[in-house]
Design a protein with these regions (language model features):
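Boundary at the C-terminal end of the N-terminal hydrophobic targeting segment
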Residues: 32-34
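Sec-dependent N-terminal signal peptides
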Residues: 18-20
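N-terminal secretory signal peptides
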Residues: 1-11, 22-25
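Alpha/beta-hydrolase superfamily serine-hydrolase fold, recognizing
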Residues: 36-346
């Protein structure tokens, strides 16, 4: 079992964020209360007087803020624009991905970026977007990290929560069926079904963790270890506190959903090594979710590597997966036992 801190992979960043946020990320301790969180926030998001508590010492406004990335990512538009440009460049170099249906619904498609190597491993990526936005094409910029290293890269399209009446069970089922499809059809595009990996960011990391804690033998009549490893970046693994936040405005949380789709409660089904990661400039609640998930995996006796990206906010953190020399890019290639490509993408 391996647990590592990112001291050896820290990357110096330019000072993108306001001083209050930078100070916050450095000062936040391993346990951050709602009261402590208040003093780190920029003036424009300072909470009103405290209301009734809804979770631990968080009131409703504080729990909403704890799961809202907007105040913590002042450069979100710049990141989105940059990634769109990098995605267009990647597709221009690699060519349009093969878009193939894994189910009958119009949205149920995978986009496959193939490597030139035969019988190659496959990384399946699940996009984030707070369960209500995002799509497979939006992470095309990550594809070259894998293709150049000798792996196929597959991004998955699935419904967003508002499209399925707020039911995350539908989205989880789609993701599982997509993975099962890739396993059964891997050889048709030169993939090795016995080297299947899953990765995800934010709400996609939650869905990746759901996939990693699925009983594949019971539910799909597939090998129990269909997935060989996984990477979960900045996800949510216990849905109870999330259900108390503004997310409940578009996700219809139920006790059954919270129980079935909280990966931290099903670690007995986790059979493979995972990487859990978050940025040091993320909200304290996101940091806590990932820190506690990694600790729970370790306590369960399962292999886990825990990474903290110093100087990275929520969006910048998973952006490093689009560079083979980035924190996540290097980590996932090492997890897949692949060499970093000889040349980094421009």
């Amino acid at each position: 079992m391996k647990e590592s801190q990112p001291s050896g992979v820290r990357i110096t960043r330019r000072s993108l964020l306001c001083g209050a946020l930078t100070t916050a990320a450095v000062a936040i301790s391993s346990k951050v209360s709602a009261q402590e969180m208040q003093k780190y926030l920029p003036p424009r998001v300072q909470p009103k007087p405290k209301g009734p508590l809804v979770f631990l010492d968080y009131d409703k406004e504080e729990i909403d803020l704890a799961y809202d990335q907007a105040p913590w990512v002042p450069n979100a538009r710049e990141i989105s624009k940059r990634n769109a440009e990098k995605s267009a460049t990647a597709i221009a170099r690699l060519g349009e991905p093969r878009r193939i249906a894994y189910g009958s619904a119009e949205i149920e498609k995978v986009e496959i970026y193939t490597t030139k190597k035969t019988n190659a491993p496959i990384n399946i990526f699940l996009h984030g977007g707070a369960w209500r936005s995002g799509n497979a094409r939006g992470v095309a910029y990550m594809s070259e990290t894998f293709v150049d290293a000798g792996s196929h890269f597959i991004s998955v399209d699935f419904n967003n929560a508002p499209e399925v009446d707020g039911n995350l069970m539908v989205m989880a089922d789609q993701v599982r069926r997509a993975i099962a499809w890739v396993y059964k059809n891997a050889m048709s595009f030169g993939g090795d079904p016995n080297r299947l990996y899953v990765s995800g960011n934010s709400s996609g990391a939650h869905l990746a963790a759901v996939a990693l804690t699925t009983d594949w033998k019971k539910d799909f009549a597939l090998p129990a270890d269909i997935l060989k490893a996984g990477l979960c970046c900045s996800g949510m693994y216990d849905l109870h506190p999330v259900s108390l936040s503004a997310s409940a405005g578009y996700v219809k949380f139920t006790p059954e959903m919270i129980e079935k789709l909280s990966p931290q409660r099903h670690l007995d089904k986790l059979l493979v090594p995972i990487i859990v990661a978050h940025g040091a400039l993320e909200t304290p609640k996101f940091q806590r979710q990932n820190r506690e998930f990694a600790a729970a995996v370790k306590q369960a006796g399962k292999p886990v590597t825990f990474l903290v990206g110093q100087g990275y906010n929520h969006f910048e953190m998973f952006e490093t997966m689009g560079n083979p020399y980035g924190l996540l890019g290097r980590a996932v290639l090492e997890q897949m036992k692949l060499n970093v490509a000889c040349t980094a993408p421009s």
